[in-house]
A protein has these predicted regions:
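Small-residue-enriched hydrophobic alpha-helices in membranes
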Residues: 1-134
């Protein structure tokens, strides 16, 4: 059986990967229960950079509430997705999630819990996080 899984390129072009990226970022924006304008703009900026497509605010708001409709928890989906990502891309995604969480100038306990769950799902170690923070 041929392996049809291909690694992510520097830009995310696959629609399913783009949806998962939007969901992960939108949930980061709503981790503290509301999506602020700076968080919304940060999600839109990252999506444009990573996918080449503009995302409207309504898409971000819908994705931020997608846990109401999901059959598989986001953490599990991100874990599966991360197995196909090179370590550098996983680290970059962790940074992007942190950027969204901090976009409104705050980083509270709910955002920290979400970030920690995503880092675990991305299979990143503390030393890998230190290397990108330096």
């Amino acid at each position: 059986m041929e392996n049809t899984t291909r690694p992510l390129k520097s830009k995310i072009s696959d629609e399913a990967n783009a949806v998962l990226l939007l969901t992960a970022l939108a949930r980061a924006a709503s981790a503290d229960t509301n999506v602020s304008v700076p968080e919304l703009k940060k999600v839109q900026e990252i999506m444009k950079r990573e996918t080449g497509h503009e995302v409207v605010s309504s898409d971000v708001y819908i994705a931020s509430k997608s846990q109401l409709f999901e059959k598989v928890p986001l953490e599990k989906s991100v874990y599966r997705w991360s197995r196909k990502m090179p370590p550098g891309r996983r680290q970059r995604l962790a940074v992007e999630i942190a950027e969204v969480c901090k976009a409104d100038g705050e980083f509270n306990d709910m955002e920290a819990a979400y970030f920690n769950a995503m880092v675990e799902s991305l299979r990143l170690t503390p030393s890998q996080l230190i290397s990108i923070a330096a």
